[in-house]
Regions:
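Secreted, periplasmic, or luminal enzymes acting at the cell surface/secretory milieu
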Residues: 4-28, 91, 100-176
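Hydrophobic helix-and-loop "lid/oligomerization" segment in the mid-to-C-terminal part
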Residues: 6-88, 99-112
Length: 176
């Protein structure tokens, strides 16, 4: 935590500055993941009973998802999962990945690494307390997903139609 608190302001300062004042109303750039090289992994393993990795993804107006870094994990995220799993498993300690995501993501390529994956979706204000209760064993995270998670983007049924690059005029749609 301390390493990230020191990393985040420096990384944010390196983000590109808006060129247009209207960009202040649009979603900003996300800071890149901190590399594992910047962490003292041996101290992290020694000082913790387990590792918790949180992967967050979001989308919304002006922030459509991309296959490369929203549906698929980035190289940095995959490296983080692999590196943390290797270090903690070597010491006989567990690793949990928490997915704080707005939609399905590819999991097939990395799901074998962590000991558990918890899908929290977008849990809101009390999400941290809910996740803590699950990790502490106070609550059972049982449930069923109301959908199937695709193994690859090719399995997403609407994938062929997104992003839609065809221009449609409102008048044409309304018959005007």
């Amino acid at each position: 935590r301390k390493s990230y608190i020191e990393y985040a302001p420096k990384a944010k300062a390196n983000l590109p500055k808006p060129k247009n004042p209207l960009e202040a109303f649009l979603p900003g750039h996300f800071i890149p993941e901190m590399s594992l090289a910047e962490l003292n992994m041996s101290a992290a393993v020694k000082n913790n009973d387990m590792a918790i990795i949180t992967i967050g993804k979001s989308s919304g107006e002006f922030l459509d998802r991309k296959i490369s870094d929203s549906f698929n994990l980035t190289k940095e995220e995959k490296d983080m999962i692999s590196g943390v799993c290797n270090a903690f498993h070597k010491a006989g300690k567990k690793v949990v990945v928490i997915l704080n995501v707005c939609g399905v993501i590819e999991t097939k390529s990395w799901i074998g690494g962590p000991d558990a994956v918890l899908l929290s979706w977008l849990p809101g204000q009390e999400g941290g307390n809910c996740v803590a209760d699950i990790l502490a064993g106070k609550e059972n995270p049982s449930g069923r997903l109301p959908m199937t998670w695709p193994a690859s983007y090719n399995d997403v049924t609407c994938g062929a139609d997104f992003p839609n690059t065809e221009t449609v005029k409102v008048g044409d749609v309304l018959g005007m």
